[in-house]
């Protein structure tokens, strides 16, 4: 008798995504791997998404629904983590899609190699660009250890630190929870999660389709809430320096790049905005400018650092030119 394949728990936080939710669920139902459960965590939706969750559960017995007051994506993910029954779990956002062979490939490789997690690049798409583009592409499948995986994440070499699309062995994830009430929760938790892994499967092809919305956290301007990323970056650097000290420089480099991006966002609004945050960023860049000359640092980041050390207006102009070139390269 053939041994039953391990159960995969799919966690989907749901909040006011009625137009996209059925497509998301259907991408799970289309999996060639059939031993899964789908946990829809309705986070206090007001657009009918919660009712749609219930309808979908009636249609498919593998779907379980949990309704809760609105507490944010992190809170909803944490509820899902508490309810998982599978050996593995997968994080999927309710407006995104998963490729049909993903679970087959993830389970096969993790079971064969004893890996604790599987990561893939994202394909990012929108209504305006349905063909999308691949974020952090790389060439070949690899089995990496903890340090190699974290290094690739820190340097954005083929994988990032987003939690959407992460496939994880449940017992290895353990008691980790996403921080509730702040932005950039993925940045805050994913390095802690990977630090618990002995081996990680990294796939070259995207198996997660990430939908970009105008006004999303990734694309909207800087507000007071966004400035928490300065603390998150500092906290992650501290954690890595203590846990995997060989990667301290790479962690500081990610913090440097994150701070530069945040400064650009502040200046997009007003050069006089958030003076304390600007001073904090400039101080960090001044103290860590040598990182931009490391062999793994990107030339574009070195130029941003050097121009900022001259003056903010030059930095802003150069950064904006780089964004314009990247945008038009993608569109071509």
Regions found by a protein language model. Give the residues of each.
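Glycine-rich, basic loop-to-helix element that forms the pyrophosphate-binding segment
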Residues: 68-84, 97, 105
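Catalytic core of nucleotide-sugar-dependent glycosyltransferases
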Residues: 207-213, 220-247, 261-291
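Short aromatic/hydrophobic "clamp" motif used to bind/position activated sugar donors
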Residues: 89
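A conserved acidic beta->alpha catalytic loop
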Residues: 34, 42-52, 69
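Membrane-interface aromatic/basic loop that binds lipid-linked glycans or pyrophosphate carriers
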Residues: 271-332
């Amino acid at each position: 008798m053939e041994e039953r394949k391990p159960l995969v728990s799919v966690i989907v936080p749901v909040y006011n995504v009625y137009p996209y939710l059925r497509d998301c669920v259907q991408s799970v139902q289309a999996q060639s791997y059939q031993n899964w459960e789908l946990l829809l965590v309705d986070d206090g939706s007001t657009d009918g998404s919660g009712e749609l969750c219930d309808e979908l559960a009636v249609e498919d017995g593998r779907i379980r629904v949990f309704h809760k007051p609105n507490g944010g994506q992190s809170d909803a993910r944490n509820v899902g983590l508490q309810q998982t029954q599978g050996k593995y779990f997968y994080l999927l956002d309710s407006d995104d899609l998963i490729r049909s062979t993903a679970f087959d490939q993830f389970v096969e490789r993790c079971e064969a190699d004893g890996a604790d997690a599987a990561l893939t690049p994202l394909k990012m798409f929108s209504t305006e660009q349905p063909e999308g583009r691949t974020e952090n592409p790389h060439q070949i499948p690899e089995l990496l250890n903890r340090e190699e995986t974290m290094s690739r994440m820190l340097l954005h070499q083929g994988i990032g630190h987003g939690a959407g699309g992460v496939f994880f062995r449940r017992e290895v994830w353990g008691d980790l929870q996403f921080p509730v009430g702040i932005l950039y929760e993925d940045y805050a938790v994913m390095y802690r999660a990977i630090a618990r892994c002995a081996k990680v499967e990294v796939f070259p092809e995207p198996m997660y389709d990430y939908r970009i919305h105008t006004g999303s956290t990734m694309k909207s301007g800087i507000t007071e809430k966004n400035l928490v990323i300065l603390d998150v970056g500092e906290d992650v650097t501290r954690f890595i320096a203590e846990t995997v000290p060989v990667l301290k420089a790479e962690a500081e480099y990610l913090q440097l790049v994150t701070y530069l991006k945040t400064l650009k966002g502040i200046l997009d609004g007003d050069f006089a905005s958030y003076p304390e945050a600007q001073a904090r960023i400039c101080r960090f860049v001044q103290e860590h400018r040598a990182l931009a000359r490391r062999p793994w640092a990107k030339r574009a980041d070195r130029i941003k650092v050097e121009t900022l050390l001259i003056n903010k207006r030059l930095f802003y102009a150069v950064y904006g030119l780089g964004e314009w070139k990247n945008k038009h390269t993608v569109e071509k």
